[in-house]
Amino acid sequence: TVYCAAGDLNGSKGSHFDTHADNFNKLKNNMLPPFDQAASALVEDLRERGRLDETLIVMLTDFGRTPQINKGAGRDHFPGAYSVVFAGGGIRGGQVYGKSNSIGFEPAEQACGPSDLHATIFHALGIDPEHMIYDADNRPLPLCDGKPLPLF
């Protein structure tokens, strides 16, 4: 059984994590404390119940934020480099994969992309990322063109 949930810890309080202005104050005072509390509580609860190994937790965004600060003390949309957190689901804890350059502008080591994240999730769910599916005309389509990250 695969259950999936998505959430926004900021609810209807405004800009969510889209911090085009006042980035640092919003993150420090409003957004990161409840995120930290919720994420750590989820991992600990699953660990205590013996469910962490069978539950994959993925925390990510649809894009990163610019390395440079804009005129409104915020950061704008930026797909060049961003962070993803994996926990549980057979992932070995306490590891870092990849590294950005010194200004956070682009990957410097072990670059990966969305297709690799998809492949990693499929792998954790026991689904072969290279599995072929067929369209209505019986044309083969790869489920994913990425490779699972070596996190297991």
Task: Give, region by region, the residue ranges found by the protein language model.
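Ligand-binding pockets and gating/stacking loops
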Residues: 1-152
